[in-house]
Amino acid sequence: EVKNIEYLAKIKINLSNNQNEEFDYLVVADGVFSKTKSIILSEEKNIEFNNSVALRGNIKNYEKEDISLYLGKDFHFVIYPVNQNKEFNFISIIKKNLKNVEISDVSLFNDDNFLKSLTNEIYNKTSVQLEGKIENIKSFPIFVSRSLKISSKKNTYFVGDALYAYPPSFAQGASQSIEASAEIFDDIKNNGNDYYNKRIKKIKLVNLRSKLNHFIFHLSNPIIVFFRNIILKILVKNKKFLELYLGKIYRN
């Protein structure tokens, strides 16, 4: 565990076992609760609970073979295949207002009654027959970054959730981490200094779309939902819209 960081001729890191290590470059990738980032920036963790809980599980022998997205009142879920053996992943984002004491209680998210309340919320609000089909169910509180904080220290790179944690409604967390890692490699290889400039632009694009998706997916007014569904059916077939909304994300 990192205890302290000094920027000398090289980057000197003091570890919890009292060992010291020196490096030319430091890549910080220890997640949304990054302690290393807090040490570098000399401030508390810049995160907040997103009033949402993620529910994950597995489904076997689901009738559809493609990726399925379902939108409901204050929740949405995705079902997608993971192999050719008709095994699927199930991921749902559910709006959930929790008290601080509940958020910090790790055991709550493994509690059978809590998990049952989450799954029942989905079962009761969708026509899709999922009851008894979802296995290995787990839940996690969702935390997002309050704001984007970068490092002015030399040869120091934040990446993944340690750099910025998005609302999970655009399926971009992992892919943005991979993309950022490639940019770090290029920056180091070419002795560049443009990593954060590129990341800031992309983070703004992804974050805006993530927040917009989250809002649209969780609409509850029946009239608004009716028109939302009609508009979405039109937009997903519109190449210009898809290029505008997705092209800037998937193409540098």
Model-derived regions: residue spans:
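C-terminal auxiliary extensions adjacent to catalytic cores
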Residues: 229-252
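Phosphate-coordinating loops and pocket residues in cytosolic domains that bind phosphorylated ligands
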Residues: 38, 197, 208, 246-247
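Short terminal targeting/anchoring segments
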Residues: 130-135
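A generic structural signal for secondary-structure junctions
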Residues: 41-44, 60, 95, 189, ...
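A charged, well-structured terminal subsegment
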Residues: 218-228
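Conserved FAD-binding catalytic core of PHBH/FMO-like flavoproteins
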Residues: 3-128
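Alpha-helix N-cap/helix-start capping motif
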Residues: 30-31, 182, 221, 239
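Conserved mid-domain beta->alpha element of the FAD-binding
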Residues: 27, 114, 136-217
